[in-house]
UniProtKB/Swiss-Prot annotation:
Highest classification ranks of the organism: Eukaryota, Viridiplantae, Streptophyta, Embryophyta, Tracheophyta
Signal peptide: 1-28
Keyword terms, alphabetized: Carboxypeptidase, Disulfide bond, Glycoprotein, Hydrolase, Protease, Secreted, Signal
GO CC, any one term: extracellular region
The protein's name in its UniProt record: Serine carboxypeptidase-like 26
Organism in which the protein naturally occurs: Oryza sativa subsp. japonica (Rice)
Amino acid sequence: MAVAAAAAARRRDVSCLLLLLCFSSSMAATGGGGGGGEQEADRVARLPGQPASPAVSQFAGYVGVDERHGRALFYWFFEAQASPAPEKKPLLLWLNGGPGCSSIGYGAASELGPLRVARQGAALEFNQYGWNKEANLLFLESPVGVGFSYTNTSSDLSNLNDDFVAEDAYSFLVNWFKRFPQYKDNEFYISGESYAGHYVPQLADLVYERNKDKRASTYINLKGFIVGNPLTDDYYDSKGLAEYAWSHAIVSDQVYERIKKTCNFKNSNWTDDCNAAMNIIFSQYNQIDIYNIYAPKCLLNSTSASSPDRAFFANNQEQFRWRIKMFSGYDPCYSSYAEDYFNKHDVQEAFHANASGLLPGKWQVCSDQILNSYNFSVLSILPIYSKLIKAGLRVWLYSGDADGRVPVISSRYCVEALGLPIKTDWQSWYLDKQVAGRFVEYHGMTMVTVRGAGHLVPLNKPAEGLMLINAFLHGEKLPTSR
């Protein structure tokens, strides 16, 4: 079995090398200098199955982040709808988590982009709640190895951690702005969900530090960040996951008491007894959708490499010993539609992706390889929150209250741990005369819940998601009356 695994690994390395050598000829163009011609070369006139109207101004392609290693990240960019002109609206970067999940397959094509993949991946449909009504939307497949993003150095895939991801994302931004200089002075915000609860604040912190020389050509007009159902702090995330499962009748009182007795979540390595108790929670969630506990479970064929049963609830208990290694944000039905669509040759051709046709294996919405090899070295992002709040950045956190994976309880614990003074107490916000959720304003931060939404708020509650991002971008308060 070990020999077969080694042989498979060698085959993957060879396939990857062939792909990247074929891409290497285009690396000079991915560096990002010059704007104009490179920008226009990335324009996507129309994707297969895209509705004829309304018009969507979009670009896609590769931007180099490390010439020596041959690393390039793939992006999909939508200009904001007119009135005012796109150049006058904010630029919003969106990152999905996992680690290992595609911001194109999830954020763009399933959640908040103007074009969503229809059922069975047959076509695209217009999303009337696309966030490009409020901002220019930039979706990035990160880290390398995710989606169409690639590296010419196979060892990169074994060295992935939060610092690596932040540095590559920063290099991407610097080079992307060279290609799209008309957006260089726009207000810039970073957003994302699930494990992007690490990516987003860490990238914001890196931009903040590099911005200290305001005269530098790499200065980025960062104004704030917003994260949804974010993994933030190991202790509070794990504590909240267990408490949410018990309080929502997923597990019995006896199981919860066992967890409280055997689990010290302040230790990153769980004991055997704690691991066994927590696996009872995961086994119960295997019967429903952990990412939206009140939604029907997707019953599509789950024999693929991205099967939730295999990827999330493997019998190998070592998978959960150090961290809860489940893709943060996985929806098997929508990911299947995205995989059907983005694996079509005519789509990839129109998308300027996988030009050589030698992508190692099929395009996947989530990569098991990235998830299982990722070095989870950062246990808490809360110190970054404290730092950037003091620096004056706008910081929002929102949470769909039906998510069992990164539940609202976890986020409340995290926010309360910051010790910020309350500005406006917990209260309801409204959409169409109905309670859309609750929010609390602190001095320096806002936390919002979205009633009835799961892990993927823009997918589950699109109208609420659009109202939320509009309030965030404009620095406004959510409506508090019917």
